[in-house]
């Protein structure tokens, strides 16, 4: 089993909070959160570590991610699939997000530092069903040095999100925590409740995409359309055009 690294100390992404309104999807947009659990009441989901409904969050990480997604996409239907940190549980959770929960979006606020063929197969399965896959692009650490490839964000089927800091004017700024990886597609605010990391940027992007799906026709519910949408609302930051810190830009979000 490979070690999974949470990102509660590092980056930011630009997000735009867009309220969910009546749109092309009659049912609420469904977002499955693959994480450490959630300590809030009345949470739907499953514990993939022991097959129970115990969603208690010993890390606190999944609770923060859930809260951020709820703030950014208040009308979305959220499911917590508790699966840390077992690679077998994570893989099954990806498949069930598609087949059991009928997910529109899967949020993965974590990284692996090594490729996994089995997980990639599950990710590809979800992508073929037009499920949007969003993942943290990682934080700089001794185990993930500058420019490291991190997964699942590095796979082309996944939208990788970096977390960035903001200055006093609310503008994105550089940070010593940036991993600087080509896994980054866009960036968003990575600060929440005194913690920092790309873990907290990813759910902001997932929430924005929930709003996008709610307002658009089903033919536009694909990764390519979603990525073009994110690029259209992102504000260029860092070097002109694409760079490995901010990706295609910072997506601004007021939540958090």
Residue ranges, per PLM feature:
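Positively charged n-region of N-terminal signal peptides that target proteins for export
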Residues: 1-5
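Substrate-binding/access-modulating region of protease and related hydrolase catalytic domains
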Residues: 81-155, 194-204, 238-244
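C-terminal subdomain of the subtilisin-like protease fold in secreted/lumenal serine endopeptidases
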Residues: 104-108, 160, 214-256
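Active-site core segment of subtilase-fold serine proteases
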Residues: 24-77, 92, 96-103, 167, ...
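Short helix-loop-beta-strand segments that form the rim/entrance of peptidase-like active sites
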Residues: 69-89, 219-234
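Extracellular S/T/G-rich loop segment that most often corresponds to the catalytic His/Ser-adjacent loop
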Residues: 27-35, 150-214, 250-253
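Bacterial Sec-dependent signal peptides at the C-terminal "C-region" and cleavage site
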Residues: 15-27
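Active-site alpha-helical elements of protease catalytic centers
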Residues: 52-82, 193-215
